Amino acid sequence: MEVQLTNRQQHILWATVRHYIATAEPVGSKALVDEYDLGVSSATIRNVMGVLEKSGLLYQPHTSAGRIPSDSGYRIYVDQLITPGLRDAARTDVLAKEVELALQNRLHWEDWSLEAVLQGAAQILATVSGCISLITMPQTTTAILRHLQLMQIEANKIMLIVVTDDYETHSKLMNLSPTEEEAKLDADGIDHELKIVSNFLNTHLRGRSLLELATLDWSDLDQEFQRYGEFLKGSVTELTRRHLTPTTTQIMVRGVAEVLRQPEFSQLQQVQTIIQLLEEEQDQLWRLIFAEPETEEAGKSKVTVRIGTENPLEPIRTCTLITSTYRRGLLPVGSVGVLGPTRLDYDSAIAVVAAAADYLSDAFS
């Protein structure tokens, strides 16, 4: 959502969101004057809040009440106002470290089953965040590499062809930007080089699982073949992602009872639909939280924040869902997240989800 706010509007929206998160009460100008050093009068704050309301970022639940953030207001807060200048960086850094240390010290990978470890991680995440925590089981693939070939199809353009053990064939194109030395190679020279690389890779990689290949360090290629390393790594990772199969859509869920006591969940029918989603319709929720953001860079997990009506599942369209993937090498194999009301401490929740995803990525790599 592209909304251009002045510095004053940003600070007043930030203060309104922070105050409402803390109190769950509609916010008036007097409360902001008393609690925040905004450097302006109550009348000025009222005028700015009126402008923010007209912009759809705040609204009044009742005519005589103060204002509360809309989904759009929370979106601006998350996208533009959680910055080093406005957020409480020290507090969120402490929370992230608390999650990391708790996960390191309380989980016993050698003695516990994988499910027990992830249940324990979910409990820690729920306790620290104050939200419902969600962690999926890691996914895998049984596909095996049968054959791999690199071939030139045009000048400075090559194709990778991969055949798996089920005889499925996959291909991907790469544009080369040759160095001055490489540009001297004629078509026969490039074909010869590609055959050497293909033979080397087939000799060393045939019979290995795609999951294993996706975690390889392709920088180990001989120096003269380094220009193919990033292409091979990205292509194999993408292919492996396509072959990932949900061995289970089970989600570890913790913290439900505490969160559903929040004032936002006072309607019994709403609570029942959320519980039904968490307990009986996990396959729908799994597909949502394991959806990898299109903008996510290879090998880097991004925290995704879905606020209110941005959630496609009806039971949680009044909630905020914050998720990130955890990885085995470059490959996303599972997700970790928290679910709570839109009146959520976004700074803290984003920090702890990122910390948990990083910990699990390190543990699985």
Swiss-Prot record:
List, alphabetically, the SUPFAM superfamilies matched.
GAF domain-like, Winged helix' DNA-binding domain
Q: Name one GO biological process term.
A: negative regulation of DNA-templated transcription
* Family annotation (Pfam families): HrcA
Disulphide bonds annotated for this chain are none
Protein's UniProt keywords contain Mitochondrion: no
User: Sorted alphabetically, which keywords does the UniProt record give?
Assistant: Repressor, Stress response, Transcription, Transcription regulation
Q: Which PANTHER family match?
A: HEAT-INDUCIBLE TRANSCRIPTION REPRESSOR HRCA
Q: Does the keyword Repressor apply?
A: yes
Query: Which Gene Ontology MF annotations are present?
Result: DNA binding
- Organism annotation: Nodularia spumigena
**Similarity comment text for this entry:** Belongs to the HrcA family.
Q: State the function annotated in the UniProt record.
A: Negative regulator of class I heat shock genes (grpE-dnaK-dnaJ and groELS operons). Prevents heat-shock induction of these operons.
**Mind giving the lineage of the organism this protein is from?**
Bacteria, Bacillati, Cyanobacteriota, Cyanophyceae, Nostocales
Check the record and name the InterPro entries matching this protein.
Answer: GAF-like_dom_sf, HrcA, HrcA_C, WH-like_DNA-bd_sf, WH_DNA-bd_sf, WHTH_transcript_rep_HrcA_IDD
Q: What is this protein called?
A: Heat-inducible transcription repressor HrcA
